[in-house]
């Protein structure tokens, strides 16, 4: 057996701020998602405000500092345990990277015990309100588009960031699939589309004029790409107009997962459909292997469950 040797700490460890800049540079080199890099930057600001002096050497941070950081949140009295752990995730990733570089002594950064919050999905009544087709002869393009978006969110379970980065060329109506390029884990997946969602997208694209394959799938009334905030505002307005107080876009993803499992879908297949890199992200479910993602998909899909009894009306042209 090869004898293990201990490496000495770096002779000149960088400052806290300098180490973090190196950490983020490495994250970009590793091709982490922009969302992950932004997350680290946002949470680092809070941590650095707590530390006050970020020009001191990184090796001055101790396990006691991390414990004091936890108490710092606790003393506020308004920060949930889940939020504390969210902040600790950045601290742990950053400090463990520094420890690997021998910038500082090793010590554990532990998450605190936290009750997992119960995220109430959209109810059947709320979904019926949201999925009810608008009057296409009188509604605005924005309302019609929002209705299609809600159908898309429930029919695919995709994230908001994935949706706003979709291009028209990502939709293959002949194959009934959608290519999700912009995923949190930086992987790309080809997900199936149900017949109903395929018909809605075909109709929606029929109302789009002078488009190119690389144009955004979902756009503003002026044909420009939707930003994250614009999408959130659109769904907030749409849901409230339909008498639904819940306005979370991500809640459609949770609703998708719940209804899918309730219909008998297996968790491993769900993991693939949601684009999770491993089963840790679907830890509520048992890992079962499945190859064919399209088998019985219309039966299992939440959108089909909620709308299978809805009569198809004749196509009505949107008013110009």
Named regions from a protein language model:
Residues 1-320:
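Conserved catalytic core of the tyrosine transesterase superfamily
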């Amino acid at each position: 057996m090869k004898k293990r040797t201990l490496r000495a700490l770096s002779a000149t460890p960088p400052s806290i701020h300098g180490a973090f800049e190196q950490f983020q540079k490495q994250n970009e080199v590793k091709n982490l998602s922009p969302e992950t890099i932004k997350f680290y930057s946002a949470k680092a600001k809070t941590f650095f405000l707590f530390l006050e002096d970020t020009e001191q050497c990184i090796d001055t941070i101790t396990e006691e500092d991390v414990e004091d950081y936890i108490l710092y949140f606790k003393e506020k009295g308004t920060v949930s345990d889940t939020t504390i752990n969210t902040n600790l995730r950045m601290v742990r990733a950053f400090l463990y990277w520094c420890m690997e570089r021998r910038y500082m002594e090793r010590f554990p950064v532990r998450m605190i015990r936290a009750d997992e919050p119960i995220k109430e999905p959209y109810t059947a009544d709320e979904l019926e309100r949201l999925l009810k087709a608008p009057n296409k002869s009188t509604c605005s393009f924005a309302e019609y588009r929002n209705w299609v978006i809600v159908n898309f969110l429930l029919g695919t379970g995709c994230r908001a960031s994935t949706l706003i980065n979709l291009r028209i060329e990502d939709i293959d109506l002949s194959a009934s699939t959608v290519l999700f390029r912009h995923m949190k884990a930086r992987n790309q997946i080809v997900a199936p589309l149900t017949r109903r969602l395929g018909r809605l997208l075909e109709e929606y694209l029929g109302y789009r004029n002078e488009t190119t394959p690389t144009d955004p799938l979902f756009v503003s009334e002026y044909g420009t790409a939707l930003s994250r905030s614009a999408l959130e505002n659109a769904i907030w307005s749409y849901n409230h107009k339909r008498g639904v107080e819940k306005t979370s876009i991500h809640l459609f993803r949770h609703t998708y997962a719940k209804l899918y499992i309730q219909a008998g879908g297996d968790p491993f297949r769900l993991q693939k459909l949601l684009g999770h890199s491993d089963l840790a992200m679907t830890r509520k479910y048992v890992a079962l292997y499945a190859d064919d993602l399209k088998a019985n998909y219309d039966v299992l899909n939440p959108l089909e469950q909620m709308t299978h009894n809805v009569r198809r009306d004749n196509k009505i042209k949107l008013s110009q």
